[in-house]
């Protein structure tokens, strides 16, 4: 299937510590392919396929970062560590309620939300979703159905990586 390699290939040119080979040796190809097809189909059925962008542009001033796929405190801190690269933008965060307090007084995030209803009234130029999981895409669709979006992990799913390095390299590649 076209694009399936995105599920286990780093989306930038730099090597970072990862367990891709171990993952590929142990994974079920059928399950991985099924998950990829399911996510692609979900994005298409939600009308989001044509809204995916591959760059954060100058006109993307107000951005909503949706961070729900890995709700553990450590994963959230590592995945969002690259936010400093967006200090010239107005960034709001929608995250799990148990992580909201971590970012309440953050100097990058203008507002921090844990409820979808609190975000719906705002206008954003772009959504950054943590991954293309059905949960993240559904939240993006509920909050801003017609706005462009991109993914930090996107379709990348499975291999363990150094999350801090991944976050910085990925966000840098989107700028």
Q: Which residues make up each language-model segment?
A:
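Catalytic machinery of carbohydrate-active enzymes
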Residues: 1-175
């Amino acid at each position: 299937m076209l694009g399936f390699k995105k599920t286990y290939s780093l989306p930038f040119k730099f090597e970072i510590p990862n367990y891709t080979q171990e993952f590929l040796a142990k994974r079920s190809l059928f399950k991985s392919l099924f998950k990829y097809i399911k996510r692609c189909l979900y994005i298409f059925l939600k009308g989001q396929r044509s809204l995916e962008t591959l760059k954060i542009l100058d006109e993307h001033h107000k951005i909503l970062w949706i961070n729900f796929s890995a709700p553990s405190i450590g994963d959230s801190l590592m995945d969002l560590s690259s936010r400093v690269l967006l200090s010239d933008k107005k960034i709001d965060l929608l995250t799990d309620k148990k992580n909201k307090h971590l970012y309440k007084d953050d100097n990058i995030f203008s507002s921090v939300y844990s409820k979808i209803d609190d975000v719906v009234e705002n206008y954003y130029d772009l959504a950054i979703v943590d991954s293309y999981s059905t949960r993240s895409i559904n939240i993006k669709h509920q909050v801003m159905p017609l706005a462009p979006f991109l993914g930090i992990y996107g379709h990348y799913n499975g291999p363990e990586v150094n999350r801090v390095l991944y976050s910085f390299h990925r966000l840098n590649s989107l700028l």
